[in-house]
């Protein structure tokens, strides 16, 4: 009986310790994701058709809200997805669909800025990619909208985690999968939520290697745009 009581006491103590233990880092990532979600959007474009028999082509991408106010909101995304778009609609918060307009294209990097007439949206926190060369192996994550499918119409953000594999010239190499539709979405540090890159591409059919544009390149583009337009 004494042994049973001791075992019971130990079990209760263990349960109490678990309940009082600090949260694991994974809980921090969950909190970061919930904070980022309202600032990550889906872009759907109608493009000129590659074949004369088609009326138009459809392209999808993701983006991050980087500026917002009473005038509307600006979204950072990739140039290759939106260049030449005839029509564009941006889905905000998984439900609200509003027209979008390309207002700037970076002639050097694969970056674009899109504006929507949706005011006062939460914006992402842009970090720095300058010191990432010494931080290979650090955990990173990306968020975006995979191409719409038969499951839920593509109106749900997807989260992928991995590690920073290498910092190449004008590119971050990551050990994580990038699927169509996620290009343009944010790459962020899993422990802080700071944006360090813009999802760009993957290598051919290799699903486990992805690339992102360093956020410092995007910030220089944004600064040039702001300076030219008096912001």
Residues covered by each model-derived region:
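Bacterial N-terminal signal peptides that target proteins for export
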Residues: 1-10
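C-terminal motif of bacterial Sec signal peptides marking the signal peptidase cleavage site
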Residues: 17-19
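C-terminal cap/linker of serine protease catalytic domains
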Residues: 22-33, 121-123, 145-152, 195-231
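A conserved glycine-rich beta-strand in the N-terminal activation segment of trypsin-fold
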Residues: 23-30, 46-75, 96-99, 184, ...
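Conserved active-site neighborhood of the chymotrypsin/trypsin-like protease fold
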Residues: 24, 70-151, 171-173, 227-231
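A short, Trp-centered hydrophobic/proline-enriched beta-strand micro-motif
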Residues: 35-52, 140-142
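Catalytic nucleophile loop of clan PA
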Residues: 64, 177-199
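Flexible, gly/ser-rich surface segments that form the specificity/activation loops bordering the active-site cleft
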Residues: 124-172, 178-182, 200-210
